[in-house]
């Protein structure tokens, strides 16, 4: 079993991370969305170690992270005009673009496909790591496959202790949900996965109407398989039932509640109230799911949010978490 070290961002930890990556090892690092489990993007063997460490299906591609546009040109065949507009508007930030891959990117990273998912993360520590390495980093979320995504180093350690040698602890992730994913190969943006960057903002920056295909896409990481699921049962409830205190099952042993609206009834042993809009809910969601697990909750009642704006991404994750 690998000994796992947790270090704060520093010159020393950065040098250790680069040494590990150059030797074919894996490093978990913070981004503004969720923590990533990184390997050298041009190293097929290292990419396969990512899949093994996570227990990730091999048909689920990885996202390639770059620190600047110069690095991007080695990853993709061509930056389309649409991709250029979206990059200018949102990079560095929580937006992943689907483009045709270059010959340098191995099939182990793209699940054998001809396209690559690529983004420039909006977290200084992530970009510093990529810049120090001098090449892109392929990284899915740093959790066991199917589990809630990690938004703290403690979440990563809980899932991957003994599977990864180094975790860079950059504190809690600001956004708390994975990046939006957009197919930018054509003239119109195709939203393959919703994120905290809304579809409306993407359409405005693109200057073109967007398409949102139904179901999963083989091009997009994180849409094909079961994701975001804690060990406890997740039950989605509308705000009106929370405001009325009309959740009979909440009185049962092992029940918990995550909510925004005021709860007038007796609070269960595990209860998390998130104040603010859908963005605040997004930032707190995965931590709440993991905290409920740790508290021994068996049935977790989670208040829904309106299915618009950032709420689309929140509801996408909640529906997947509730799926059995």
Locate predicted features:
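Active-site-adjacent structural elements in enzyme catalytic cores
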Residues: 1-324
